[in-house]
Amino acid sequence: MEKKHNYVTPEEVKQGCRVLNPDDRDAQRICVINEEFRQGFEIIESQKSYKKSVTFFGSARFKEDHPYYEKARSLAKRIGTELGYAIASGGGGGIMEAANRGGFEAGVPSLGITIKLPHEQATNPYVTQEIPFYFFFSRKVIMTFSAEAYIFFPGGFGTMDEFFEIVTLIQTNKIVPVPVILFGSDFWGKIKECT
């Protein structure tokens, strides 16, 4: 699968934002948010192969030898091979890398919907299309846009934030209900007890 990097980085978006008053931080912020949404939707809409996808969420910390890594990789590969769906993730390491790797091995688009963070890893090498973001909330909108299912592996605060936002959006009918699959009953069972 050929890698595509025809995107504008968050830094380029910030530099390209022109507002009447350059000192108006709110106007600058609104410009960046608008550009992130525009670019994200434009990339997804321009690629017919992205219309159906499965989005994977989970820890960036799992290494290649961890059982969850292998399960995410093989599941993503199977989804890509048998259903032809694109695979999307946050584009980082761990579960995100495993999912993108499975999609890459299946020969389907492997999207990395990335965010630049201090002290975090680079985009994983299995991403064939990167869509970079500065703001978490605009990134989450794009991560949910064309998904036919959401698959959650154990993770930290970022994974939990994504999980709770998505199930709340489904519960309140703000997004179309699609399957939410929780992988790892020891981890997710505790949350299920609370609901």
Give the positions of each predicted feature.
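Short glycine-rich anion-binding loops that position phosphate/pyrophosphate groups of nucleotides
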Residues: 59-62, 116-118, 155-159
